[in-house]
């Protein structure tokens, strides 16, 4: 059993040595993900595993959802990405990971989020149709001419539309 545990540690920690602490480089996202998604469970099968709150928080529970809010102000449509669990200044990077069909996205704070069941389709469609870039998305509020409201009306669920937007359309 002990030899199996040593083999598991060698697989999970590429810089492992018998005289030093097992480590994973911070830049090695694939190995970190392997440890978070499968490695801890494998280690638990051969012994007790203790972890810190910081380690346990490296994997965001669930999948991210980013909805789109629409409102009208001075004949301009305001588009606001609404994401409770995603930092607003990282929505663009999250969308880029989603578009590249990555299984996971890593936020600037080091937290990973599973994109397998991410609900980003609505935002992706609007960003594509309006040819918006990551910086515009990260700003939190995008303003476009009012005549484009009719295009957006069909793409966004009614619960994302303000009363001013519904009245305008």
Q: Over which residues does each language-model region extend?
A:
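Accessory nucleic-acid engagement and inter-domain coupling regions
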Residues: 1-169
């Amino acid at each position: 059993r002990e030899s199996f545990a040593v083999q598991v540690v060698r697989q999970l920690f590429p810089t492992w040595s018998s005289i030093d602490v097992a480590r994973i480089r911070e830049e090695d996202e694939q190995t970190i993900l392997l440890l978070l998604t499968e490695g801890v469970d494998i280690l638990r099968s051969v012994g007790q595993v203790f972890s810190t709150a910081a380690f346990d928080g490296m994997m965001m529970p669930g999948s991210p959802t980013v909805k789109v809010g629409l409102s009208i102000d001075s004949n301009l449509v305001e588009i606001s990405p609404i994401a409770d669990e995603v930092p607003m200044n990282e929505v663009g990077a999250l969308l880029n990971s989603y578009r590249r069909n990555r299984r996971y996205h890593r936020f600037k704070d080091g937290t990973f989020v599973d994109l397998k069941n991410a609900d980003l389709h609505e935002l992706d469609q609007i960003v594509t149709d309006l040819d918006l870039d990551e910086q515009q998305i990260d700003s939190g509020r995008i303003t476009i001419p009012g005549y484009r409201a009719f295009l957006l009306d069909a793409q966004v669920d009614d619960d994302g539309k303000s009363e001013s937007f519904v009245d305008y359309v």
